[in-house]
Amino acid sequence: MKKSSTQFVVYGGLIAALYVVLTLVSQLFCLASGVIQVRLSESLCMLPCLTSAAVPGLSIGCLIANFIMGSPWQDVVFGTLATLIGAVGTWMMRKKAPQWSWIPPVLSNAIIIPIVLIYAYHVPDAWWFLVLTVGAGELIACGLIGIYVYPVAQKALGIQKVQPQ
């Protein structure tokens, strides 16, 4: 599927905006940050399978959402990095194993975010506990909710089958 640069920017911008809105909705229920978090926006992490515009879209959306929520700089920087790593991993899996493409964002967030929680939010030394709680939240958002978002997005974008990009 050949896309113009305008369409790439529009898709990326829409994904970033949707990420911000869904993160703020999650924040209304105190689920967007902290030891136990299930960001609804993370359900969009399957989108790099459908369009490479989702990689910068998700990353910019995370950056903006963390900034708007007043997160410490470590969370803004390293939370965005975790999302970028997960999005790139998902994009790399799009052809060979799209059904498993939810794994990179779960792993990147489960490994990086506990470190952020310990240093930026001064959560007591409980790295393994944080890996489990953040990983479980990511599993719910990416693995469970994301599985349902994927076909809806696929239909909305008019993609019949994942195409090499």
Segments predicted by a language model, with ranges:
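Hydrophobic transmembrane alpha-helices
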Residues: 1-49, 53-56
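Membrane-helix boundary elements
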Residues: 49-69
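Membrane-embedded alpha-helical hairpins and interfacial helices in multi-pass inner-membrane proteins
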Residues: 24-35, 43, 63-165
